[in-house]
Design a protein with these regions (language model features):
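Active-site helix-to-loop segments that bind/position phosphate- or nucleotide-bearing substrates
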Residues: 1-112, 241
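Structural signal for hydrophobic packing residues in well-ordered secondary-structure cores
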Residues: 41-48, 131-134, 138, 223-226
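Short terminal or interdomain "cap/linker" segment that borders an active site or interface and mediates
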Residues: 141-232, 241-251
Length: 265
């Protein structure tokens, strides 16, 4: 089954300051950091354009046979086991935050870092809001949903981004483009698959027990133990717990700002 591509616009979801701190590399909030986050949130206010485009497809489109690895990923195959349909989606918060990051990467690295963290939290919150809408909508239709699964998770290759863009027409639908090096612009964007399976196969409680968290971003299930953004229950050795000066050292060590020409306009 090929799908009509649907576009949805969202108001910015509620802000999770704890996630912003995590993406900044902070284990605790100091008055200095709190003031920085407040200032950056004020500057970013009204600049986000939260959009999602998606389509519902037969999972057979990706799994040609029992032995086939959909989009070249055995991990994705496991995630889609038992799923007769799959939702492919792309989400973005727009280009304006990229422009702020680019501007402050030269003027104030601390603000650039904070805007990076805000952008990461904003796009994840947008995806979570879309995930929840899909869960509710398809529960009423007799389906349960798997956690979302994105290119770059496990063995799911980034080259699969091309298939998302071909099927969803992302540039026209939500202004999202893909570079030759497989980077998305705007940079604070996500593509992912949500598997749908009949509610008769197992209870929702069992599904949640077998799967990562409902939004598909549970650090406990990820094999990348040295990830700089690993959640606090499994803290990485590299994340600082101090103030701005320590965070900036972490920023210089771990962060590379990759911006397209559009972000500098």
């Amino acid at each position: 089954m090929m799908s009509t591509v649907i576009t949805r616009k969202y108001d910015p979801p509620a802000i999770d300051r704890g996630e912003i701190l995590r993406y900044m590399g902070c284990r605790r909030q100091t008055p200095e950091i709190e003031a920085l986050i407040d200032s950056c949130l004020d500057e970013a206010n009204g600049r986000l354009s939260c959009k999602v485009c998606y389509g519902v497809f037969d999972t057979d489109l990706f799994c040609a046979g029992k032995e086939a690895a959909p989009m070249g990923s055995l991990d994705l195959k496991k995630n889609l086991t038992g799923c007769s349909r799959s939702i492919l989606f792309a989400a973005t918060i727009g280009i304006d935050l990229d422009r702020l990051i680019f501007r402050y990467s030269r003027l104030s690295p601390a603000r650039a870092l904070c805007f990076q963290a805000i952008g990461a939290e904003r796009i994840e919150s947008l995806c979570n809001a879309f995930n929840e809408d899909i869960r509710i909508e398809y529960k009423e239709k007799g389906f349960l949903s798997r956690p979302r699964f994105s290119p770059g998770y496990g063995d799911f290759p980034l080259s699969s981004q091309k298939q998302f863009f071909d099927l969803l027409d992302c540039p026209r639908k939500i202004g999202l483009s893909l570079t030759e090096s497989l980077l998305m612009s705007p940079s604070k964007s996500v593509t992912a698959i949500i598997g749908l399976y009949p509610d008769t196969s197992e209870t929702e409680e069992n599904c949640q027990r077998k799967s990562p968290d409902v939004h598909g971003n549970d650090c406990k299930t990820c094999s990348k133990l040295d990830c700089s953004f690993r959640k606090p229950d499994l803290p990485p050795e590299s994340i600082p717990s101090g103030g701005i000066s320590l965070i900036l050292r972490w920023w210089r060590r771990y962060t590379v700002i990759i911006l397209t020409p559009e972000a500098t306009s």
